């Protein structure tokens, strides 16, 4: 299943790598290098999944996660980070999935697939 994905990461090579890989799978990927206009971007793009880096140069991804949850309760958010330690942070619980960054995107792809499937079934029920 293809999805509209919004990828938020301040590292250019990650944006390029993930964007390329996910687009190759048929997804429609938009990227943001900063958390600055995230909420506006979500409103404009209406993504089905947000892939969010926890440590952005200008924002704390966990705070952005709370903002997303306030405005878009059912939008699946996949936290992506190079730091495994965040898994034990209470604030990450609000995310649907937690993926440790790697050049192997299989974990991320599985999370995206699950997010689409779960969210699809939710929106059909309502």
Question: For each of these PLM feature ranges, what is it?
Answer:
Residues 53:
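Active-site residues of response regulator receiver
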Residues 63, 83-101, 106-110:
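Alpha4 helix (beta4-alpha4-beta5 surface) of REC/receiver domains from two-component response regulators
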């Amino acid at each position: 299943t293809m999805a509209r994905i919004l990828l938020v990461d301040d590292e250019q090579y990650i944006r390029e790598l993930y964007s390329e890989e996910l687009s190759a799978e048929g997804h429609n990927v938009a990227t943001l290098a900063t958390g600055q206009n995230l909420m506006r971007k979500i409103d404009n793009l209406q993504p089905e999944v947000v892939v969010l880096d926890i440590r952005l140069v200008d924002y704390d991804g966990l705070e952005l996660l709370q903002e997303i949850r306030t405005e878009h309760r059912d939008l699946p958010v996949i936290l992506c980070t190079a730091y495994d330690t965040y898994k034990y942070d209470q604030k990450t619980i609000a995310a649907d999935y937690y993926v440790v960054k790697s050049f192997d995107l299989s974990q991320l792809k599985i999370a995206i697939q699950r997010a689409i499937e779960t969210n699809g079934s939710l929106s059909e029920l309502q």
